[in-house]
A protein has these predicted regions:
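Lectin-like carbohydrate-binding module/patch detector with strong preference for beta-trefoil
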Residues: 28-173
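Secretory targeting and sorting signals
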Residues: 1-27
Length: 173
């Protein structure tokens, strides 16, 4: 009987090793999200109405604790990032076909219209410009210095002015 038990235990141990039964628990890494606020208005970059839809507009609005104002920076090679909305998992997208406005769309790593770079423009205040890879001399701009909620930023020629400078406040979750 002892020999049968020993054989069964050996077989069970071998099966566990093959199946990876002896694994080490790993915690999921925390993702750092950022809330981007325009310097001139203090308003946050927001996916309008918390929409999950492909093509939903990115707008500026009063900063809240909503996940539609939190964005992860996903590495896209050569110092560029995809800016992914926490609430929808979709990425900020711009381009000529969108009249250089910003929307969320399904993330596709091979789309240059979804790759951005963050340019630090003021080390003291931590202000950045968000520039699309296809238009390196252009950056995310709130039009006409507007401070109104619901205004959709577009891509404008970088002039290092306050509607083009954004604070990036980290939030880990």
């Amino acid at each position: 009987m002892a020999r049968i038990a020993r054989t069964a235990l050996t077989a069970a141990a071998g099966l566990a090793a093959l199946l990876g039964g002896a694994t080490t628990a790993h915690a999921e890494p925390n993702t750092t999200y950022f809330r981007f606020a325009a310097e001139h208005s203090g308003k946050c970059l927001t996916v309008a109405d918390g929409s999950l839809a492909n093509g939903a507009a990115a707008v500026q609005s009063t900063c809240t604790t909503g996940d539609n104002q939190l964005f992860a920076l996903k590495p896209a090679g050569q110092g560029y990032f995809m800016i992914q909305a926490k609430h929808s998992g979709r990425c900020l997208t711009t381009g000529a076909d969108l009249n250089w406005k910003v929307q969320q769309k399904w993330c596709t790593s091979d789309l240059s219209t979804q790759r951005w770079r963050m340019v630090l423009v003021d080390m003291t205040t931590g202000l950045h410009q968000l520039c699309p890879v296809d238009q390196p001399a252009y950056c995310l701009t709130v039009p006409d210095y507007s401070t109104a909620d619901g205004v959709q930023p577009g891509i404008g020629q970088c002039q290092n002015v306050s509607p083009q400078r954004w604070t990036a406040t980290a939030s880990v979750s």
